[in-house]
């Protein structure tokens, strides 16, 4: 995708809204409705189904996005024993959730269709429907979560909302409300990956 848009809006919106696109594709093809663990992990039954990565190339003087590479990796056919013991506790696959195989080409085609719709919405500035659906699917909202910093520190907070820039609005134990951004912290449930 050659977006020619500002880095902050394009990269962040695309990364998080692509998670919505993946959820839509899985729902349409497989009949199951994934949730989203903030910031961009599609989940089923409290376990990670998919990983999403973004790579940006910026124009030097204007910091406008020249290229945006989308990386989406879905666990399609893994059985529990295919995962390492550590990953087995937090990951799942479509075959585990459905009990039968899923056509990879059909899933890839459905994801491409949804990403095409996303790119058209992004170009038209129509972010509202993706943000609303993201909020609806976000499994963290209304729950107490652990905010883990890259340095190993962290704190607990109540996840309240997703702001217009896809930041996670939280209430700390002292009552202070703040917004955390992707890259600043990672989020885990108190008792597992999402719970």
Residue ranges and their predicted role:
Residues 1-6:
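Interfacial segments of multi-pass membrane proteins
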Residues 7-9, 16-34, 44-195:
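Long, positively charged amphipathic alpha-helical accessory segments at protein N-termini or as interdomain linkers
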Residues 37:
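Gly/Ser-rich oxyanion-binding loop with an adjacent helix/lid
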